[in-house]
Amino acid sequence: KHNLTNNWGIGYGISYRYAKDYDFQTYDNVSGNIKPENTEAGLNEQTTGFYFSLNKNWATGTSFSISATGEYYTIGNYHKWAVYPQASLTYLKGPQHIFQLSLSTDKSYPGYWDMQSSVTYLNGYSELQGTPGLRPMTNYNLNGTYILKQKYIFGLFYTHTSDYFAQTPYQATDRLALIYKNTNWNYMRMIGANVILPLSMGNWYDARLTLVGMQARQKCDRFFDVPFDRKKWLFIGTLDNSFKVGKNLSFELIGNIQTPFIQGTLDLASSFNLTAGMKWNFAKDRCSLTARCSDISNSSMPDMKVRFKEQYLDMDSGAYTRTVSLNFTYRFGGYKKQKVKGVD
């Protein structure tokens, strides 16, 4: 990176990454009617990138930056050229009003094991299949934010993910089997708004209310023999409360609720999470005792089902997500962190 005159700056670079992967799976002492096959496979992955950026800062606090990364990616027989742009703009109309606009792109890669042709049998009914040729997903994010009085936040967002992949269950039509398999979708798209509102009463109560509303669209033309194109509205609300009782005792209570949602052909039920905690400092602040219970109602994991075309499935994970923790800390008096000299 280089700093230029008048608060301009530029940056550039080049990168190369190579990875070689080898996976194998063998079975021994197999019982029942399952006839698994031993598998082995290797992958070579190469990524070459070129980067350039430009930025500018003004004395008023306004700033902007743009950048682009060109990439040539290859794995197995898959080759792709792509450009990933980034841009951000911050405009200050005084300290009480701040506007921000940003565009970002990133890439998520599947695990190497997910790209193999192996089959892992979870039990006599369920199996996990690999997906040779599974492609990375590319995510584009556009965000606009308005900050009022440096604490109230209002935002709009749009997200488009091409080649989105997720593990979705499928009931085979030619045999009695439930297949879990990562599949590239056409896209996953989300558009919505969010609000963050801090609340307070005197010196004893502080809270933050976060509200999110969005619509998601998920499309896949090649999901076995049941292609889907689904839309769903989602609303999320979180209230984070903090109570101070005197100087040394404080409590927290956090509630989160989420309306039903979708993942491919799956329908996810609503979920709720209530967490409570306490912190007590004593012995002249040398000792602290912290207690916390997360997911008190054990309802943060949503029930899942499939009611799509000829697919009919109920999934009950039986997950127990409630946790209780107790932590005690003692600080020895007079302790001072030693300074470490730098290497000459």
Task: Describe each region flagged by the PLM.
Residues 1-2, 46, 50-56, 87-91, ...:
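Residues on the lipid-exposed face of transmembrane beta-strands in outer-membrane beta-barrel proteins
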Residues 14-20, 68-76, 103-109, 119, ...:
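Transmembrane beta-strands of outer-membrane beta-barrel pores
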Residues 22-31, 75-84, 112-120, 125-127, ...:
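Outer-membrane beta-barrel translocator domains and adjoining extracellular loop/strand segments
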Residues 107-156, 160-162, 178-193, 197-200, ...:
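Outer-membrane beta-barrel signature, preferentially recognizing the C-terminal barrel domain
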Residues 1-80, 85, 92-96, 152-155, ...:
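Face-selective signature of the C-terminal outer-membrane beta-barrel domain
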Residues 43, 135, 153-210, 219-240:
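Outer membrane beta-barrel strand-and-loop segments of large Gram-negative receptors
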Residues 216-218, 237-281, 287, 297-298, ...:
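C-terminal beta-barrel architecture of Gram-negative outer-membrane proteins
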Residues 282-344:
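C-terminal beta-signal and adjacent terminal beta-strands/loops
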